[in-house]
């Protein structure tokens, strides 16, 4: 260890510098010295000395965190005796020093929790030494309040620690520990926590007593941690909060059948200070979410009745709900009433009429206070959305009263949004419409709520729309209206158009009537009339948010009323015909296209409107019938014949253009490409006519590149725009005839320009990314469009260009040197990822015979593959899995290489082969199922190749095996641990994890077993012996059945038999392991 940290005094100084100094360089030096200390051999003994003799809290904190790191490491772990000593020392230390700084106490409790979790299956003299959790804390709980707080904190932190997966240890190990803890300790901890809460609530809590408050807070946290435990290993995503079900074990039934448990938390809510109430409500949210199957029907009805009574009591005494945290948790609680119970069950609760009235009043009041806790409104709208959606299915005879209250909620939402406009403009507040995600979420919920009692919703919207539209028109006609008043009306109309779009989008075909379709027509007519008014003013002024709301409505209208599945007799079209003369879908499409062209003309420099407009055009061009109707429109023919910057300003190139702002051009040309293809056939003249603007752009670029002093920025902008346009066309041309015309147009005339650009600007991802993505599109044999004639060399020529581009880019990008972590993906890894995708598409496209390259001495294939290897070796293993797009492109390419180019893989240097095998080994446990499945496939190809080569080498007849095969065999024989590790990993996943791709896992497993029969036999014995004695015979039998009837070959019939056996094996193993805790060392089996 370095000199500066030899003494405790110096360690104390370094801790002080680390945590207190404001000088960055001093802090960094201290951090560096302390990192050296952490990694030194003396760390353990010095940490104990720091805890014993350290004079500052910071040195105690350092000691606790260092010890936590030491006990957490998966390589070179501390001996069991040492970990037991540390655990005992920490408990004694906490018991003798109740006045430690809170952060030191917390760090020591974290250390205890980590040791206990990681040692959960460690045993000594047939006793699990780290499971005496309740015994460990009993001495704290029986002492003063201060000690009691420490004891409860230990249980709380331990429960939380065991519930959280740790990236440095296998997920299987985590699940086994969590399951064992759940079955052996968690219910006792929960019961203890509830009993202590009952004792605390029975006493009158002294508001001035800080330690009592701490105890109550820690008890509530502990209870919440118990209820929030991931009982069945589903790792629920917090973002799907309103769908959460708490999978309480059946053994806990008694606690929930006892109404006093539920009553305890409602009583606590009303009796304790408001700052504790959010945690109480969080516990109630979890209790309200217990799985339905925990109860029979009568028990569930009784439980729901108590729950609804508690909610009613809170609504009748709502004073504490003025606190935002209480309000938020209470809204979550209300949402759980419907996510976990059916409307038919709710209406049977005795107080339902009164409760639904109170909830409606609460919701209306909440919506009227739109500026207060907008994120909490989501839960209220979620409740009403679910209630409204259930109305058609409710069978109960009791009235649900939603026809009374749902319109009130709809009205409150609509009117409150309109009233907010003036206040936001007047006071300069943040406009909710700026948060598109939140608004869309609320509108999705309103779409269902508003369709309930739809006639009332429509009447309200028509009345409010007519008022605002009339006022708006009068203000415009006056010519001198204050801008504030205009802005208010435009804001109100924006909300109304969004809401109209939402309720139209909420139409459900089986529950809609002609009358409702006619109402939709009434609403759409008004919006189209408003559009005519606003479009007529675009030359002078326009409102971006209002335009975006109209595009939102058009998108909803398209989904519901345009397309192959829509009944053309819809009353909506009759209403449009009566009012606006729009008799059918074609005439409405004409309006849409007119609006699209208008937007592109006037809003070409407004990215949000341009991208939304082009997305609408793109969506319209996908429908089979709508695209054929569109092509007949004169406006569409105009677009096909005039797609230049003169008519569409967003296609223009100027010095203000940002290279990344051109993405929408791809969308535009994808739509145009689809429209062109409808009648294109093999008409080369029509194709040439369409491509004229792009031809001119390429010719201009060629002239620039030929001159020595061209404007680089202008050339980049022209090229990126052109390449994005071409990618859109290439994507749309998925028929052979049209794609061949495009290929003949770009090759060989313009391909050199793309290659030259890669050479010049390889370091600028704004240029290289679009070019590489275009190449990926050109080599992608989508819909078998790349089927060249037998006399055509075009397939090979295309691959040569591909190889040249990958090699040029790859060799140059590797010259960039070390890059900052935050720029690594953008500047390097993204380009490498696309190169992998290009190569994968080319190799798997089935239009090139790759055998001819070596035969004729063509180095294109070899160059591309060697570049792949160079690029791969420049990427650390961790980055391969850290960046999802890179993972997917690499593993899908590797799948193709191992399937069709195994001789190339076998010829690689040993360190490259080991790199690839390591990447497969790590990918087998990836969270991304696509990556995991790809790795299984790669491993299967490699194992099959190995098996075949070994089989051949065992036979004396025939030609000798190729040299690379022998080298590959030799490498694998030198490193058997790699294949053995993968065998244990695959078996581990199949036996112990939630294996979502069992078939894929089964394919390489047979080959792995046949290649490692001795290792498999040892592994099998280890697994069997790790089971409790009474389960060992059953596990032994499972393995016997797995290999029953399996021969020593990899023929298809034998593989299929093994796959069937494996399904049965997995079922039997799971049945065998149910209700049993695994033996002490089973978790170490393959970790």
Swiss-Prot record:
Name of the protein in question: Exportin-7-A
Cysteine-cysteine disulfides: none
Role, per record: Mediates the nuclear export of proteins (cargos) with broad substrate specificity.
Keyword Nucleus appears in the UniProt entry: yes
GO terms under cellular component: cytoplasm; nuclear pore
UniProt source species: Xenopus laevis
Record GO terms (molecular function): nuclear export signal receptor activity; small GTPase binding
Localization (cell): Cytoplasm; Nucleus
Domain spans labelled Importin N-terminal: 30-96
Family, per entry: Belongs to the exportin family.
Tissue: Expressed in oocytes (at protein level).
Record keywords, A-Z: Cytoplasm, Nucleus, Protein transport, Transport
PROSITE patterns linked to this entry: IMPORTIN_B_NT
Entry keyword Ribonucleoprotein: no
GO biological process, one term: protein export from nucleus
């Amino acid at each position: 260890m370095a000199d500066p940290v030899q003494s405790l005094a110096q360690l104390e100084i370094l801790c002080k510098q680390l945590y207190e100094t404001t000088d960055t360089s001093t802090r960094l030096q201290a951090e560096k010295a302390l990192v050296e200390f952490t990694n030194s051999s003396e760390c353990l003994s010095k940490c104990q000395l720091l805890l014993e003799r350290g004079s500052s809290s910071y040195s105690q904190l350092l000691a606790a965190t260092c010890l936590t790191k030491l006990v957490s490491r998966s390589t070179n772990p501390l001996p069991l005796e040492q970990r037991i000593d540390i655990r005992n020392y920490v408990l004694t230390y906490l018991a003798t020093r109740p006045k430690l700084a809170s952060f030191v106490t917390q760090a020591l409790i974290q250390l205890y929790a980590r040791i206990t979790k990681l040692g959960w299956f460690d045993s000594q003299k047939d006793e699990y030494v780290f499971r005496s959790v309740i015994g460990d804390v009993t001495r704290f709980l029986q002492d003063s309040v201060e000690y009691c707080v420490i004891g409860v904190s230990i249980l709380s932190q331990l429960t939380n620690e065991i519930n959280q997966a740790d990236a440095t240890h296998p997920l299987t190990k985590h699940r086994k520990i969590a399951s064992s803890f759940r079955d052996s300790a968690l219910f006792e901890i929960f019961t203890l926590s509830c009993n202590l809460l009952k004792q605390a609530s029975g006493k009158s809590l002294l508001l001035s007593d800080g330690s009592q408050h701490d105890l109550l807070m820690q008890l509530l946290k502990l209870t919440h941690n118990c209820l929030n435990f991931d009982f069945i290993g589903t790792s629920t995503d917090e973002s799907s909060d309103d769908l959460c079900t708490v999978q309480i074990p059946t053994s806990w039934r008694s606690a929930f059948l006892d109404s006093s448990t539920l009553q305890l938390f409602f009583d606590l809510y009303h009796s304790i200070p408001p700052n504790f109430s959010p945690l109480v409500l969080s516990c109630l949210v979890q209790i309200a979410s217990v799985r339905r199957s925990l109860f029979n029907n009568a028990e569930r009805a009784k439980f729901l009745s108590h729950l609804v009574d508690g909610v009613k009591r809170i609504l009748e005494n709502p004073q504490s709900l003025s606190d935002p945290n209480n309000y938020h948790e209470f809204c979550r609680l209300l949402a759980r009433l419907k996510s976990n119970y059916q409307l038919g069950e709710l209406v049977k609760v005795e107080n339902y009429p009164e409760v639904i009235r109170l909830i409606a009043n609460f919701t209306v009041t909440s919506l009227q206070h739109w500026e207060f806790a907008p994120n909490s409104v989501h839960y209220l709208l979620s409740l009403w959305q679910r209630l409204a959606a259930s109305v058609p299915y409710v069978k109960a005879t009791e009235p649900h009263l939603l026809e009374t209250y749902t319109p009130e909620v709809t009205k409150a939402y609509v009117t409150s949004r309109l009233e907010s406009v003036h206040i936001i403009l007047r006071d300069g507040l943040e406009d909710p419409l700026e948060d598109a995600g939140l608004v869309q979420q609320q509108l999705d919920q309103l779409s269902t709520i508003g369709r309930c009692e739809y006639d009332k919703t429509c009447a309200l919207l028509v009345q409010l729309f007519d008022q605002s539209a009339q006022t708006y028109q009068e203000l415009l006609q006056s010519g001198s209206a204050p801008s504030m008043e205009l802005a208010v009306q435009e804001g109100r109309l924006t909300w109304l158009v969004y809401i109209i779009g939402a309720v139209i989008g909420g139409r459900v075909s089986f529950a809609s009537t002609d009358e409702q379709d006619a109402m939709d027509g009434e609403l759409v007519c008004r919006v189209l009339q408003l559009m005519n008014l606003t479009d007529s003013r675009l030359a002078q002024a326009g409102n971006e948010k209002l335009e975006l709301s109209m595009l939102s409505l058009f998108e909803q209208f398209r989904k519901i009323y345009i397309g192959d599945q829509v009944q053309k007799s819809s009353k909506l079209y009759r209403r449009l015909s009566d009012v606006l003369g729009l008799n059918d879908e074609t005439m409405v499409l004409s309006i849409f296209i007119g609006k699209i062209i208008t937007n592109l003309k006037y809003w070409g420099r407004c990215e949000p409107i341009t991208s939304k407009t082009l997305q609408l055009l793109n969506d319209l061009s996908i429908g089979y019938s709508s695209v054929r109707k569109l092509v007949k429109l004169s406006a569409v023919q105009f677009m096909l014949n005039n797609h230049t910057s003169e008519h569409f300003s967003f296609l223009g190139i100027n010095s203000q253009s940002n290279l990344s702002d051109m993405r929408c051009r791809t969308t535009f040309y994808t739509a145009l490409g689809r429209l062109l293809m409808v009648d294109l056939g093999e008409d080369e003249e029509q194709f040439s006519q369409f491509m004229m603007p792009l031809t001119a752009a390429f010719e201009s670029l060629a002239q620039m590149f030929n001159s020595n002093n061209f404007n680089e920025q202008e050339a980049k902008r022209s090229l990126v725009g052109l390449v994005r346009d071409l990618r859109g066309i290439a994507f749309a041309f998925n028929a052979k005839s049209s794609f061949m015309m495009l290929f003949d147009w770009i090759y060989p005339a313009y391909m050199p320009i793309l290659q030259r650009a890669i050479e010049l600007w390889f370091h600028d991802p704004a240029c290289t990314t679009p070019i590489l993505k275009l190449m990926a599109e050109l080599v992608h044999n989508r819909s078998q469009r790349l089927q060249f004639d037998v006399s055509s060399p075009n397939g090979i020529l295309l691959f040569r260009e591909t190889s040249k581009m990958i090699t040029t880019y790859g060799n140059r990008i590797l010259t960039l040197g070390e890059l900052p972590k935050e720029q690594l993906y953008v500047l390097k890894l993204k380009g490498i990822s696309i190169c992998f995708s290009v190569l994968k598409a080319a190799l798997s496209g089935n239009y090139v015979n790759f055998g001819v390259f070596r035969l004729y001495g063509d180095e294109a294939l070899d160059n591309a593959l060697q570049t792949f290897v160079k690029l791969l070796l420049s990427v650390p293993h961790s980055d391969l899995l850290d960046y999802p797009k890179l993972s997917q492109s690499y593993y899908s390419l590797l799948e193709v290489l191992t399937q069709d180019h195994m001789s190339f893989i076998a010829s690689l240097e040993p360190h490259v082969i080991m790199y690839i095998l390591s990447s497969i080994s790590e990918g087998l446990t990836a969270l991304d199922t696509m990556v995991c499945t790809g790795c299984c496939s790669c491993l299967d190809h490699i194992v099959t190749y190995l098996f075949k080569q070994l089989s051949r080498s065992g036979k004396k007849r025939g030609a000798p095996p190729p040299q690379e095969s022998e080298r590959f065999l030799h490498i694998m024989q030198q490193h058997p641990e790699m294949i053995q590790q993968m065998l244990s990993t695959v078996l581990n996943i199949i036996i112990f994890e939630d294996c979502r791709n069992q078939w894929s896992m089964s394919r390489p497993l047979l080959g792995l077993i046949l290649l490692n029969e001795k290792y498999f036999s040892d592994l099998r014995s280890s697994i069997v012996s790790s089971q409790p004695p009474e389960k060992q015979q059953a596990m032994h039998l499972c393995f016997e059945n797995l290999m029953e009837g399996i021969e020593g070959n990899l023929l298809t019939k034998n593989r299929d038999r093994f796959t069937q056996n494996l399904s049965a094996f997995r079922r039997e193993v799971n049945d065998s392991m149910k209700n049993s805790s695994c033996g002490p060392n089973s978790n170490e089996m393959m970790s």
